[in-house]
Amino acid sequence: MFAEFDRTNFPIVKVTMNSSPESLEDFQDFLNKWTELYEEQNDFSFIFDTQSVTNPPLKYSIKMSQFIKNLRKRDYQYLQKSIILINSNKVQWMLDFIFLIQPPVAPVYIYNINNNDLIEGNILLNNNIQKIIDHPHTSYIEPNKPFLPLF
């Protein structure tokens, strides 16, 4: 599986992306695990570690946008915020594309881990989460309605 969900520090859920999805089923499994968190009806936050993602296929960006659209229809958003750790321009472009089509349902903070030492040895330190959110190089994407109602 390309994404591993670590709930050890719930309500913070760390999702480590080990690669790009190998198949549609692999990607659907990722979406199913996300949906399961919603079905538990507890607030949570994501930390996505995308350091191992090298060449994300465009087709999954479209599917992710459709998934966000479906999440938006829910009465309550259990996802409170997401922090996305990146080290690749390709991943940044993919995220820009996804959120252009379908803005997030909760605040998103995108942090390039190449900026400084808030990540030690590829491990996010719990006391650095707020520092990442507040960091001047962190990009903030506001939850919103879609700019283009394409999907």
Label the model's feature ranges.
Residues F2-F151:
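Amphipathic, Lys/Arg-enriched alpha-helical "gate/interface" segment within cytosolic domains
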